[in-house]
Amino acid sequence: MQKKEKIRKMFAGISRRYDFLNCLLSLGQDRKWRRFAVSKLPEGLVLDICSGTGDVAIEASGKNDVVASDFCYEMLELCSSKISKKGILNASCIRNDAENLSFRDGTFDGAVVAFGIRNVADIRKALSEMHRVVKKGGKVVVLEFSRPTNPFFRAGYYFYFRKILPVIGRIVSKKDGAYSYLPSSVMAFPQRDGFSKLMEGSGFSDIKYHDLTFGIVTVYTGSK
């Protein structure tokens, strides 16, 4: 099975427990991380890629018109339901593949992807698509897990991340693979300078990154 289809099925299987597990496993820090990422977006029309259940899109809708996109129908269904229940009128949902976006060149003032870029089959292609659909002078924001830099904190965090988190995730979601996949995917993901170089290679400039919560996550920004 190709990685793309495997990932889609995995997220479809955990979609109903996804929000609860995000909050539980991050000890509530995920909300703070999303707020910080959204604060880096420009005002205007924003594309939320790999939107999942729509938390970033909902956060961004406070100051932006938002299009939430995801390739997993089950996730997008929850996203649409949450937006509707909150009475948000300036956000919409559309099924879309991060590696092959259906939007015209230069459609958006900004784009954001939170905890999704590491899951795409071709990271360079997804970044190039983000670059394509953002206007000249527009900005992109990427929020992703990182490996902590402090050696003392890192040791304890790795134990939690590799041993405890998958067990909790498996019990709550009743799915074996999803939360075992998370640690392995984070360990394989290019870190800080490495990912910044991928962004640069996709055409972005003025690339910066900000570590949050002892480097558990990193927010990357870049301009077109």
Describe the predicted segments one by one.
Residues 138-145:
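Conserved beta-strand signature within the Rossmann-like core of class I S-adenosyl-L-methionine
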Residues 99-110:
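A short acidic, Gly/Pro-enriched loop at the edge of an enzyme's catalytic core
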Residues 26-44:
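Conserved alpha-helix/loop element of class I SAM-dependent methyltransferases that forms part
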Residues 5, 147-198, 208:
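C-terminal alpha-helical "lid/dimerization" subdomain adjacent to the S-adenosyl-L-methionine
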Residues 18, 111-112:
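Hydrophobic beta-strand segment of the Class I
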Residues 196, 203-224:
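Core SAM-dependent methyltransferase catalytic element
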Residues 124-136:
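A short glycine-rich, Lys/Arg-flanked "PGG" loop and its adjoining helix->strand segment in the class I
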Residues 45-100:
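Class I SAM-dependent methyltransferase SAM/SAH-binding core
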